[in-house]
C-alpha cells in the first residue's frame, strides 16, 4: 500500500514539474516577445537606425525576388516581353507630359491679362471699380448689421487718420512671409529690398524648344541694385532614362541658371564683411584684418550651384539644388497663380486643413489598433504590423 502511495506521489510530483516547466517556458516566451517588442520600438525611434533601414530598402528596389529567379526560362522570356511593353508605356507617358507642357504654355497666354491686371492693382497703376471690388462674404464671415456699420465707421476713421496708401503695399513680401518654404529664405536684411518687388511672372519655353520655364522677379527702382528684372531658368526633361527607364515618373528638373545681380556699392546683402584680430607669433603685435564671406540671403536664390558635365555633385550642392527645385516648382505651380490667397492666408489654411485630415486619419487608425489590443487577449502587434514599404518618387 505504501508502495502504491509512493508511486502516485512520484507521478504527481513529475506532473507538477512538467506543469512548472510549461509555465516557465510560457513565461520565457512572453518575456522574449515583450523584449522583442521593446527593442523594435526603440529601434523605430532611433533616426539613425531608420535611415539605415531606409537605405537598405532602397538598395532592394529593383532586386529580383527568389520567385522570379525560380521561374522557367520560357516564363522569364514572357516577363521580359512585358518589360519591353512597360518601356513603351513610359515613352508614351513622356509624350503625354510634353503635350501637357504645350497646354500650359498655351493657357499661360490666357492667364496673363488677368495677372497683368493684378499687378496693376497691386502697384497702383489701376484703381478697381466698385463693381470689381464687390465680394460676397461667406455666412460664417458675415456679421450682424450693427456690428458691420460700427466696423465700417471705425475703418473709415482709421483711413482718414492714415496717409492714403497706394495699391497694396508690400504685397509680395507679405506672401513670402506667410509661406514657410519662402519665409525660411528671407532674412531681415532682405525685407527692405523685397518691399520693392512689383511682380513675379513665369515664362514657358517656346514651341519646339527644349522644355524649360523662367521665373521673372520684377522690381521697381531701388537703392540696392540696378536690375529691373531678376531671372531664374529651370531646364526640364521629359524622357525615360535609357539606363533606368522604369524610374520615369514625369518631367524632372535637370538644372537651373540664375542671373548676375548688379549690386550698388555697399548694398550686396549676399556678402558680409567680418573683422578678425591676428597676433604676430614673434613680436606679439596684434592687427585687425577684414574679410568678405558669404551671407545668408534670399538673393542667393539667383546664384545656384553649377551642375558639372558629369552630373556629380557633393552632398551640400545636391541638397541646395534639391531645395531650389522644390522652391522653383512651388513658385510656378502655387504662388504665382494664387498669390492673393497666400497674401490673405486662405491658401495656407487650406494646406493646413489637408494635413489635419491626414493626421486625424492616422489617429483613427492608431485608435483602432489600440482597441484590437485591448479587446483581443491573443493580440500580438508583430502579427499585425506591415513590413516597411519603400515608394519610389
Swiss-Prot record:
Key words, A-Z: Cytoplasm, Developmental protein, Differentiation, Nucleus, Phosphoprotein, Spermatogenesis, Transcription, Transcription regulation
Compartment list: Cytoplasm; Nucleus
UniProt cross-references to Pfam families, sorted A to Z: NAP
UniProt region (Disordered), positions on chain: 1-36, 132-165, 347-393
Main location: cytoplasm
Compositional bias ranges of the Basic and acidic residues kind: 1-10, 145-165, 379-393
Acidic residues bias spans: 11-30, 132-144, 347-378
Annotated Gene3D superfamilies: 1.20.5.1500, Nucleosome assembly protein (3.30.1120.90)
UniProt GO MF annotations: cyclin binding; histone binding; identical protein binding
Subunit text: Forms homomultimers. Interacts with histone B4. Interacts with the B-type cyclins ccnb1 and ccnb2.
Record's comment describing the protein's domains: The NAP1L motif is required for the histone chaperone activity. The acidic domains are probably involved in the interaction with histones.
Task performed by this protein: Acts as a chaperone for the linker histone to facilitate deposition of histone B4 onto linker DNA. Required for both remodeling of sperm chromatin into nucleosomes, and linker histone binding to nucleosome core dimers. Plays a role in tissue-specific gene regulation. Required for primitive hemopoiesis, acting upstream of tal1/scl.
Name of this protein: Nucleosome assembly protein 1-like 1
Source species: Xenopus tropicalis (Western clawed frog)
Gene name of the record: nap1l1
Amino acid at each position: 500500500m505504501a508502495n502504491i502511495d509512493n508511486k502516485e506521489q512520484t507521478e504527481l510530483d513529475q506532473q507538477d514539474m512538467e506543469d512548472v516547466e510549461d509555465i516557465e517556458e510560457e513565461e520565457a516566451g512572453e518575456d522574449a516577445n515583450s523584449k522583442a517588442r521593446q527593442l523594435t520600438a526603440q529601434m523605430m525611434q532611433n533616426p539613425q537606425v531608420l535611415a539605415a533601414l531606409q537605405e537598405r530598402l532602397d538598395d532592394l528596389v529593383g532586386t529580383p525576388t527568389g520567385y522570379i529567379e525560380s521561374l522557367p526560362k520560357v516564363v522569364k522570356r514572357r516577363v521580359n516581353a512585358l518589360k519591353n511593353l512597360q518601356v513603351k508605356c513610359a515613352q508614351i507617358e513622356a509624350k503625354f507630359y510634353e503635350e501637357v507642357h504645350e497646354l500650359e504654355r498655351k493657357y499661360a497666354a490666357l492667364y496673363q491679362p488677368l495677372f497683368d491686371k493684378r499687378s496693376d492693382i497691386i502697384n497702383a497703376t489701376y484703381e478697381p471699380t466698385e463693381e470689381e471690388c464687390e465680394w460676397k462674404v461667406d455666412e460664417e464671415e458675415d456679421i450682424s448689421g450693427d456690428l458691420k456699420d460700427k466696423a465700417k465707421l471705425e475703418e473709415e476713421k482709421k483711413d482718414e487718420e492714415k496717409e492714403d496708401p497706394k495699391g497694396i503695399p508690400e504685397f509680395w513680401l507679405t506672401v513670402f512671409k506667410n509661406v514657410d518654404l519662402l519665409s525660411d529664405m528671407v532674412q531681415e536684411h532682405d525685407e527692405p529690398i523685397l518691399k520693392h518687388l512689383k511682380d513675379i511672372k513665369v515664362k514657358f519655353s517656346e514651341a519646339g524648344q527644349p522644355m524649360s520655364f523662367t521665373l521673372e522677379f520684377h522690381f521697381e527702382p531701388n537703392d540696392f541694385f540696378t536690375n529691373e528684372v531678376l531671372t531664374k531658368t529651370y531646364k526640364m526633361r521629359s524622357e525615360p532614362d535609357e539606363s533606368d527607364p522604369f524610374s520615369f515618373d514625369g518631367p524632372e528638373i535637370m538644372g537651373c541658371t540664375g542671373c548676375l545681380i548688379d549690386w550698388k556699392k555697399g548694398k550686396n546683402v549676399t556678402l558680409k564683411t567680418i573683422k578678425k584680430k591676428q597676433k604676430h607669433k614673434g613680436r606679439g603685435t596684434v592687427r585687425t584684418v577684414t574679410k568678405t564671406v558669404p551671407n545668408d540671403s534670399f538673393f542667393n536664390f539667383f546664384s545656384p550651384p553649377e551642375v558639372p558635365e558629369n552630373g556629380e555633385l557633393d552632398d551640400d550642392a545636391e541638397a541646395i539644388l534639391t531645395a531650389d527645385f522644390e522652391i522653383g516648382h512651388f513658385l510656378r505651380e502655387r504662388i504665382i497663380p494664387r498669390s492673393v490667397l497666400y497674401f490673405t492666408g486662405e491658401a495656407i489654411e487650406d494646406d493646413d486643413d489637408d494635413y489635419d485630415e491626414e493626421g486625424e486619419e492616422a489617429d483613427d487608425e492608431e485608435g483602432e489598433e489600440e482597441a484590437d489590443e485591448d479587446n483581443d487577449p491573443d493580440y500580438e502587434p508583430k502579427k499585425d504590423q506591415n513590413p516597411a514599404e519603400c515608394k519610389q518618387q
